């Protein structure tokens, strides 16, 4: 909005360590789909559209490493998903000194409770990647078979930043 200007955007910014479960494994999947190629052209005063339909089958096996699922019921799942991807290249073993000056959430959802969400994310990504191998103007997935195997789960505290702001006397955080 026009009245939401940069001079008063940030009320407070706070570093917060959020607990995550990191799932690694693989998903073997296959899709049956309908691929459609559409061609449109004009001849004289007429516009023509030609559609060609194709039966499509794809299968594949995708490996996943460290798919994050937040382990706190206090954090919004969609908000946590929106700050991905995380850079794991500089992850280190936990040291309490890292928490100095930061807030930290504790996990209250164990790895078994978070597993369905991890599997859903892995399976949706596998389906989407299989679909993306279909080179048609549009692709309608008709069936999707999958088998997911989680091979490893690790616990991690990942640093995030929360931004607090007020707009029209209503508090928001991002």
Which residues does each PLM region occupy?
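Charged, low-complexity helical/coil segments in non-catalytic cytosolic or luminal regions
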Residues: 2-171
């Amino acid at each position: 909005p026009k009245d939401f200007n940069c001079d008063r955007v940030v009320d407070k910014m706070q570093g917060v360590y959020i607990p995550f479960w990191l799932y690694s494994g693989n998903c073997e999947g296959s899709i049956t789909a309908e691929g459609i190629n559409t061609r449109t052209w004009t001849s004289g005063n007429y516009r023509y559209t030609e559609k060609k339909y194709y039966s499509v089958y794809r299968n594949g096996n995708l490996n996943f490493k460290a798919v994050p699922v937040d382990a706190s019921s206090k954090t919004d799942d969609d908000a946590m998903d929106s700050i991905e991807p995380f850079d794991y290249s500089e992850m280190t073993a936990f040291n309490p000194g890292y928490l100095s000056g930061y807030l930290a959430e504790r996990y209250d959802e164990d790895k078994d409770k978070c597993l369905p969400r991890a599997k859903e994310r892995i399976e949706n990504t596998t389906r989407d990647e299989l679909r993306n191998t279909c080179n048609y103007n549009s692709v309608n997935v008709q069936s999707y078979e999958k088998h997911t195997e989680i091979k490893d789960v690790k616990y991690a505290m990942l640093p995030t930043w929360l931004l607090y702001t007020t707009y029209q006397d209503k508090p928001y955080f991002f």
